[in-house]
Amino acid sequence: MSKSALDPVEFLKGALEIPSPSGKERLVAEYLAEGMQKLGLKGFVDEADNARGQVGEGPVQVVLLGHIDTVPGQIPVRLEGGRLFGRGAVDAKGPFVAMIFAAAGLSEEARKRLTVHLVGATEEEAPSSKGARFVAPRLKPHYAVIGEPSG
């Protein structure tokens, strides 16, 4: 599938349709990793069930981290008036999907200067923070962006 064949709204809608309460993120992680691969990124699921991606081969390390778990409960997924609704649309599958598409759009020049690591972390909504704790000792970025909404 070409980069242009993966629609960001449809991709996010698909992620929202996969329930992923804390501790049960594996299916959405696999979906996101597959999407990253379709966009030309190295996409995979790690031992903590984080959805992970990487692009670029440069010396400057950047982490783009969002979480892919949600609080329990269902919100019907719907597109209404140009807005997408569903559990995780804002907190925080939406920000992570935006990060995926931003990374996929990096220029060749940027890919030579940067290595961008994408982390769709598990269990952020739980006290364990399993996903972030797993990657913290493994990634030593120069810069990090956390895709977490604020009140």
Mark where each language-model region is.
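Phosphate-binding glycine-rich loops and adjacent basic patches that engage nucleotide phosphates
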Residues: 1, 14, 60-65, 93-98, ...
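Acidic/His- and Gly-rich active-site-bordering loop/insert found
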Residues: 1-89, 111
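Residues at alpha-helix caps and immediate loop-helix transition turns in enzyme cores, especially N-
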Residues: 28, 76, 95, 128-131
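Generic detector of well-ordered alpha-helical packing
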Residues: 68-70, 92, 124-125, 149
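Short, conserved micro-motifs enriched in small and acidic residues
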Residues: 86-97, 122
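Acidic/histidine-rich catalytic neighborhood of metal-dependent amide-processing enzymes
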Residues: 97-151
